[in-house]
Swiss-Prot record:
Function: Binds to 23S rRNA. Forms part of two intersubunit bridges in the 70S ribosome.
GO CC terms of this entry: cytosolic large ribosomal subunit
Stated name of the protein: Large ribosomal subunit protein uL14
GO molecular function: large ribosomal subunit rRNA binding; structural constituent of ribosome
């Protein structure tokens, strides 16, 4: 039976289980035209571990992460934003049995409510991210 998120989640509460492919301190390229080019993941929204306190938080496709801009426009650098993971290299399995893996990792910068800051998304976007975040689906040109 699929699990459904609690009140802490932002966006659509239903969450597919996706194998985490992006972890703390990962450098990830940005797939939109918000002005940021490269970000570092500094947190995963909604992640907690009751049993293992040393576990490094991981995020998969469709998860919201907290990032700091490392490369991009000077007014955006060193600023903290939230972002949605739209692609990951690590393979994950869909409920129909197919395995999906992209050739790069990518995030889209969003507001705390989940609305994208940019007006277009470059490259393909995973179906799991578009089902959980409908506003990202509106900007996506290719949905895989």
């Amino acid at each position: 039976m699929a699990k459904r998120g609690g009140k802490r989640t932002v966006g659509v509460s239903y969450r597919f289980h996706v194998t985490p492919g992006i972890f703390l301190n990962s450098l990830v390229p940005v797939a939109d035209n918000s002005g940021a080019r490269l970000v570092r993941v500094i947190g995963v929204v909604g992640h907690y571990s009751k049993t293992v306190h040393r576990r490094i938080p991981g995020a998969g496709v469709g998860d919201m992460v907290v990032v700091v801009v490392r490369e991009g426009k000077p007014e955006l650098r060193k600023q903290i934003f939230r972002a949605i993971v739209v692609r990951q290299r690590r393979p994950y399995r869909r409920p129909d049995g197919t395995w999906v893996a992209f050739e790069d990792n990518a995030v889209v910068i969003v507001t705390p409510e989940g609305d994208p800051k940019g007006s277009e998304i470059h490259g393909p976007v995973a179906m799991e991210a578009t089902l959980r975040w409908p506003t990202i689906a509106n900007l996506a040109s290719i949905i895989v």
